Structure formats: structure tokens, C-alpha cells
Swiss-Prot record:
This is D-ribose pyranase. It catalyses: beta-D-ribopyranose = beta-D-ribofuranose. NCBIfam families: PRK11797.1 (NF008761). The lineage of its organism: Bacteria, Bacillati, Bacillota, Clostridia, Natranaerobiales. Substrate binds at residues 28, 102, 124-126. Pathway: Carbohydrate metabolism; D-ribose degradation; D-ribose 5-phosphate from beta-D-ribopyranose: step 1/2. The active site is at residue 20.
Length: 135
């Protein structure tokens, strides 16, 4: 059995296959997931698993150099936005954070390796993680 925090085999597979700058989306419970994107559905019920819990677990496994958030996250769900930024800075103080509007974000999702759907129901709890290198 794996000793690291992340036990989900699908997420582990995707993160292990990611190269530099490849993207992984973590979303709330209601995202439109493009047909061409791999869907990793973790949602069990409202709030389970939580977005922040899922993000923290993935960050423990994946080297992330940049992220994409929506301006709507900051405007509509500011508490969540600040929790996300604080957590990201714990893992990488130099992380690059880009904000784009939600419609542009949905288009960008189709360029990521997979979409991890959580049970989160806080509006605009979505992020694209861009893989970094460990050297």
C-alpha cells in the first residue's frame, strides 16, 4: 500500500505522468467537463470531499509552479480565494498565480490532463495546477 498521503490511484496515475507545465484541474461539484478531458469524479455528496482538502492532498504529491484561478473566485467567494492562496504559498512561496474570467477558465480546462471533481458547493471553487519540476 502507498505510504504517501494521496491514495486515489487515478489521481496518482495522472500526476505521475505529468510533465513540466502540464495542467490538472480540481473543481467544485458543478463544472462543465469537456468531452476530451479525463474525468476523475470524487464527489460523494454535498461537501464531500471538500475542495480545500482535495487541493491540499494533491499539492502534497505534485510539484506546482503556477496556478490559474478565476476572478469570480476572488469576487464571489473571497474566503475560499484567500484560503487557496495561503495554502499555495505554504507549498511554494514563489508560485505564479494567474486570474482569468470564468468563461476563459472553462476553455482552459480542456487543455488540462484531467479534471478532479470534488463535492464542494462553494461557488467558483476551481483551480488549474501547472506542474513544475523538482530540480
Amino acid at each position: 500500500m502507498k505510504k504517501t498521503t494521496l491514495l486515489n490511484s487515478e489521481i496518482s496515475r495522472v500526476t505521475s505522468q505529468m510533465g513540466h507545465t502540464d495542467g490538472l484541474t480540481i473543481s467544485d461539484a458543478g463544472p462543465p467537463i469537456p468531452q476530451e478531458s479525463e474525468r476523475i469524479d470524487l464527489a460523494l455528496k454535498e461537501g464531500v470531499p471538500a475542495f480545500m482538502e482535495t487541493l491540499e492532498t494533491v499539492l502534497s504529491e505534485l510539484q506546482v509552479e503556477a496556478v490559474v484561478l478565476t476572478t469570480e473566485t476572488r469576487e464571489v467567494s473571497p474566503q475560499t480565494y484567500h484560503k487557496i492562496v495561503d495554502l499555495l504559498k505554504q507549498y511554494n512561496p514563489d508560485i505564479q498565480i494567474t486570474e482569468i474570467d470564468h468563461e476563459s477558465f472553462k476553455k482552459e480546462v480542456s487543455n488540462t490532463k484531467a479534471v478532479v471533481r470534488t463535492g464542494e458547493c462553494t461557488p467558483f471553487s476551481n483551480i488549474i495546477l501547472k506542474s513544475g519540476v523538482v530540480f
